[in-house]
UniProtKB/Swiss-Prot annotation:
One of its GO terms (biological process) is intracellular distribution of mitochondria. The gene is clu. HAMAP family: CLU (MF_03013). This is Protein clueless. Residues 719-731, 752-762 have a biased composition (Basic and acidic residues). Residues 420-662 form the Clu domain. It comes from Drosophila pseudoobscura pseudoobscura (Fruit fly). GO terms for molecular function: mRNA binding. Residues 18-35, 988-998 have a biased composition (Low complexity).
Amino acid sequence: MALEMDSKNSNSAVTGDAAAATTKTNKAKENNNLAGSKKNQSQNLVNGNGTAADGPATKKKGKKNRNKSPPVSTDEAALSNGHVEEKKPEGDGDADADANANVVAVKDEKAEGGDGADAAELDTEDIDLDALHDAGIHVNISCPGSELLTVQLSSMELVQEIHQLLMDREESCHRTCFSLQLDNVTLDNFAELKTIEQLESGSTIKVVEEPYTMREARIHVRHVRDLLKNLDPADAYNGIECTSLTYLNTITQGDLLDKKKTRPDSVDCTPPDYVTPGVFEPPLLPLHPNFKNAKGPQALKVLTTSAWNPPPGPRKLHGDLMYLYVITMEEKRYHISACSRGFFINQSTDDTFNPKPDNPSYLSHSLIDLLSHISPSFRRAFQAIQKRRTLRHAFERVATPYQVYQWAAPNLEHTVDAIRAEDAFSSKLGYEEHIPGQTRDWNEELQTTRELPRKTLPERLLRERAIFKVHGDFVTAATRGAMAVIDGNVLAINPGEDSKMQMFIWNNIFFSLGFDVRDHYKELGGDYAAYVAPRYDLHGVRVYNAVDVEGLYTLGTVVIDYRGYRVTAQSIIPGILEREQEQSVVYGSIDFGKTVLSHPKYLELLRQAGKHLKILPHSVYNERDEPVELCSSVECKGIIGNDGRHYILDLLRTFPPDVNFLKLQEVKLSTELVEMGFPIEHRHKLCCLRQELLEAFVEDRYVNFIRIAAVHLQQLNAKKPEETQSEEKKQLPAIEEAEKENKENLNVNETPNEKEKDTPVETKNAEAMVNAIREAQSNVATSNEIQAAEVVKQACAAVGSMKEKEFDFRFNPDVFSPGIRHVDGEEGTSGSVAKQKLLVQDAAEFLVVKQIPAFVKEHLSHSSPPIDGQNLTESLHSHGINVRYLGKVIKALGQMPRMDYLYRIAVMELIVRATKHIYYTYMQSTDPMHLSVAISHFLNCLLTNGPINPVVSNDEMHKKRGGNGGKHNKHKSSKGGKGQQQPAINQNGGSTTSSSSSANAYDWTLVTPRSLWQQIRKESKAYWDWDLDCDSMDSAMSKFGIMRICLLRAFCLKVGIQVLLREYNFDSKHKPTFGDDDIVNVFPVVKHISPRASDAYNFYTTGQAKIQQGLFKEGYELISEALNLLNNVFGAMHQENGSCLRMLARLSYLLGDAQDALAIQQRAVIMSERVNGIDNPSTILEYTHLSLYSFANGHVGMSLKLLYRARYLLVLTCGEDHPEVALIDSNISLILHALGEYELSLRFIEHALKLNLKYFGNKAMHVAVSYHLMARTQSCMGDFRSALNNEKETYSIYKSQLGEKHEKTRDSAECLRLLTQQAVLLQRKMNDIYSNGKLTSDLPPIHITPPSMGSVLEMLNTINGILFVQISQRDIVKVRSEIEKRMKANTDVNEAIKSMVAAANNNGESEVLAPQDNNKEQAATAQQLTNGDKVAVSS
């Protein structure tokens, strides 16, 4: 199970194909784990991987000769255990948003001591990984009819892993029904290898064919079908079985590591037309290159179950299990019997049943062997399929953790497939034949995994892996169930009620629809509130899960948007269906505060969680006017299940309300906010602040707290009262000045020069504060405790702390909830309702006044610019800014010319979201028989101005059914899915129709482009308080530069539409752009929680800190270990694994190993394509990194192809006007220049220069580099005059920014001298020709030396932010000691404050809720350090 096995030594160790195991058979075996006994539960829940980090990966201590390659150095070894282990489908991806919760949780644990186990592992130096790494054993495996096979396994693996391995190897993949025997004793599938006494290195395990049962025969047939369609991308396009697409192999035409270096003169470097600068609307077809040839050879025409099934009684007694029907490529038809000994041809025909064996009879234990025997075409095709399958990269064959859906798909041939048909029946749950006891008790599984022990690292890995697997299965089942509910395949538990009020149970999961049932949300916004409540509830579940308090349980929760409906799927609390909710709830309120209950155990558990989540315990009056203490919002309900567990649910108000979007009598907002248009009355009253905002707000207050404490500490230690007074006079203005400086720094209109000027002032202020505290610290221990307490008290009062003598910032989530009567405490204390309200107001003001300007300022440097709406949303969320502030963000961006691209992305995101609100209403009132016509009509109205002619089929079926065709088109809602108040028809100039369903079912035909854009405009004003000022797609294009193809992509991904892969003519004047055949599918948009891998995260962040200090090798080792742990928890395929791979590739490159970098980055690209999507922004960035490493390895042509792909995807996503396009164009230009394609090179660099001037200004370093590249290219073309002008620009920028003596300025001056020389020479020759009058004679050749590949690579590194610089050992020691000094000073600040507060609070027993201070800024300056004298710096 070698995760960190050196690829050079792994020939015998790594066993072949690395079990991709994407078959349901293997899923079945995994699921069996869950059915095991309690005794083996911890082992069984974690499929196949026993406890931990697989293989002889490196130890943290005592291993000096660690491999430099990352934990995964061969494709086969890469996949978790040295053999790929199947990853089950797990939900979709708010992964980044969820990661924020994880980060915050970890930070909180650090700040507050955590809960023991989690705090302990933060110091990676203290973790001994010996427990996870074992030497492994070599085992021989003997298969019937095959050579002896030798594999290396970890002693911690389960026997089942060997099953997985054999089922994926080419020679044994067709075997499913076998046992493994050692010395004639059958091994238990769920036994760890180390528990088998007779097993030792060199032992031979024998594969023994077992008799089939009905279940095993079905599994075998399914496995054969999966092998035959292994290359078929249909499942990936249809979004099933956790398959997804990757096109890296298609673009590189094979493994990059197998390529030979290319000579520059042999490279075909002409870019496709759609990649050259100036293309406005990129084509759609190149998104899926070569999809026509992806399917592979056909082995059989038909393989299906026979209509003669099941075997009659007499044949059952002869051992018949089932009958199959096959048509071979030779057009021969066979009826096949499956019996306990294998498969044989029988004598049945389509009309006659004759189950006796055919003559001559041939019995085979494997169906593949039998089919190969009767059909030569099958034998050839199967071999070809197997060969192509084994040539694919291992990462292409593993199932992804979450289903990735494609927004564009080609026309797929629909083939006969009995197994697919069988899976589609609603009675099927997907795993009946695999699990004892049939349906799974999801709640029990989810809670049991959380109860697993977590004290040691192996235990935590086991627990997190179990949580991840069960959660993934639950998300898949919930998604499938939600689709079945909306499609009308599930019977409601209350079928007699109105369809909007119906609830469903399927597969032990409870489903409810996003409508206001029984006026529950009437006071809060009705259907609008009911629609957003599940999303807020999911946020609550996420943060409570991240805090992970032992004994406190949340429900498994998934929110699915499908066909215009929002469905919430939840696991079921044991016993809750047996009694009324009123009887179940022991904590909280079921009627928004009218009746309130409390419970001591819940108070204890929620108080623990509240420390991390900054929730203030508070008291409210119940219906009997008795005070009741709560440690959560009133809506949070506590129910003790029949299993004795304490569950909390309805966590939609976990965080305090956002008063900027509530019109409240008692709230007076600041003048600044009122001028900006606040408060805005939102359409529901559930608006909450984000956890990230509260963290930032508390951190901001903590910085002020330290500042003020520093001043008072200095005063406290002054020797004379007079000195104290004078110091106060000096210091307080200094503090005010510092605060003023901070405010100025957040001014978004500052120029870069102003920003640079401000920085030294900040530094001086910080240094002054550090010195003050260090001086005070020397005496603080002997200070009078009363005086110390006074210092703390003053600092607390100044920053508005909830407690008088402690830094304590916690929020009351109920403080503005209507109908709740609070118990008011003394004024100025934490119990004071006025003080609680003020704090929530301050946090909301902080969002607008500080966080939005900070967000804009952060993106002014364009260091990691958002590429699409999803990127933008993630960035907003990381700053704690809710998307409802998007209108305000757009206004801020609109004042910044250099933020044009982000302004456009934000406007497009707003249009997409507004359109989504309208679309959901539109879909709910559409007859299922008209869905494709209705969707295509909607897209025509949104994206085109051509003829709109919705054609409704008038066949008899439609007439008979009227408009009430589907189960859920009856869910008529006036809410517009959180969109419009009126049905679409009322806003199209038509009259209001009757409310009959038949009339409503045709509302969609009345929508026109004009009416739709009017609705979008109205929605943008109502929801975001921003006037779109567009009445058509054309006006949006001309005003904002939005491309229709970008808008189509964004909208399809947002609402779950799959369109046909073809070129769309948006300007067609004769027929609509979209027809009903262009809508291929609709898919669910799934929101869920991503479980975390806490230890891996801690290794990763520690590794990053080491890298920032310049300790690349140490950082590399830590991040390698993080990847090791991630492989254990998540398996081979996961977004976080991809982040680790990208970092390891970059580190390998910086450490000088370009080949290693290429191997790792190739895996990172494939992983990103598969888990994020083929056109995801992350994938685009991975492609650009891979192109650099390809060039460094001599694959010049391949590097260009990768850049062309990246550029195409980037333009398809956000258009050409983007800083990232400038970077890619600079790279392309430089490589084309190296290949002598000067004219092409010039086109790309001119475009890059134009963008760099626009976004960085005419004095930026990016612009200087672009001018220099242009000069190089023009000089090679002989245009010395232009080259000279451009190099002069470069020189002037370097001179003004870096000074005359800087190396770059001197290089540019030298370049100018050479260009001037060349220009003079050329002019002389021209003059000679003219003076001689020989105009007809040929010009003498100009000697131009093309650049060397080394100089091109150096320039590529510069463009991509990588510098290699020479530093002497003395310099390294000097800089490092300076950094250590700074870090110590920073630590001293913390120590001073802690000791001061401890003194003030009785021997340090108080809880100081302070955010974690970090040394990132100090560490960043250490980036140039390393252990050698040549160093790489990555910026």
